[in-house]
């Protein structure tokens, strides 16, 4: 897949060898059709600009089985110290992810996305040529019809619909801040 721009990177090491990494960065799902910040409906306007996205995480096969949980938990403490009040993360069913690590580290599940995303793939190896975000940035195309029209003279490429991703949120404020955010968030938790 593709990964958005990240600003913070944390690793877990065993005997000096890097065994896992998590990366945090800008929100990728920035639909502002409602007029405000896209996460204001989850945490309230007051805290909406104090969030960050866990963009990518991975551990090597030989790492301890709880390495991912420890890495996420410790990195979230650092992110909280840097002033972030919440973190958003996604699980990708196409990559076999069901959000187990988020459930293990006490995140709230917000359900799956409803927006269809169209990616362009190579016919030979099924690798992604352009994802939905790049299609919009480079060509201002989001509808399947427009993308298929654009692809007519480009052999070897085809459109594929991505499965919606699961969305999770972790509150990281102090007790009072988390209570305020929960007033907004509570009805949305699945």
Each predicted region: which residue ranges?
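Short beta-strand-to-coil "C-cap" segments at the C-terminal boundary of structured domains/repeats
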Residues: 169-174
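Short hydrophobic/aromatic beta-strand or adjacent loop that forms the aromatic wall/cage
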Residues: 7, 163-168
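Class I (Rossmann-like) S-adenosyl-L-methionine-dependent methyltransferase catalytic domain
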Residues: 152, 162-163
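Short, cationic low-complexity segments
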Residues: 180-190
């Amino acid at each position: 897949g593709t990964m958005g721009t990240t600003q913070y990177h944390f690793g877990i090491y065993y005997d000096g060898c890097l065994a896992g990494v998590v990366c945090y960065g800008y929100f990728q799902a920035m639909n502002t059709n409602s007029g405000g910040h896209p996460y204001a409906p989850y945490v309230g306007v007051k805290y909406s600009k104090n969030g960050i996205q866990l963009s990518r995480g991975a551990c090597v096969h030989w790492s301890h089985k709880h390495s991912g949980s420890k890495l996420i938990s410790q990195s979230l403490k650092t992110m909280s110290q840097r002033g972030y009040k919440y973190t958003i993360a996604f699980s990708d069913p196409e990559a076999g992810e069901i959000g187990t690590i988020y459930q293990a580290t006490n995140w709230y599940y917000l359900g799956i996305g409803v927006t269809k995303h169209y990616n362009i793939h190579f016919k030979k190896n099924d690798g992604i040529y352009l994802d939905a975000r790049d299609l919009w940035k480079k060509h201002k195309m989001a509808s399947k019809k427009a993308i298929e029209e654009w692809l007519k003279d480009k052999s070897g490429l085809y459109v594929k619909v991505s499965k919606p991703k699961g969305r999770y949120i972790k509150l990281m404020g102090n007790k009072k801040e988390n209570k305020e955010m929960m007033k907004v968030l509570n009805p949305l938790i699945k």
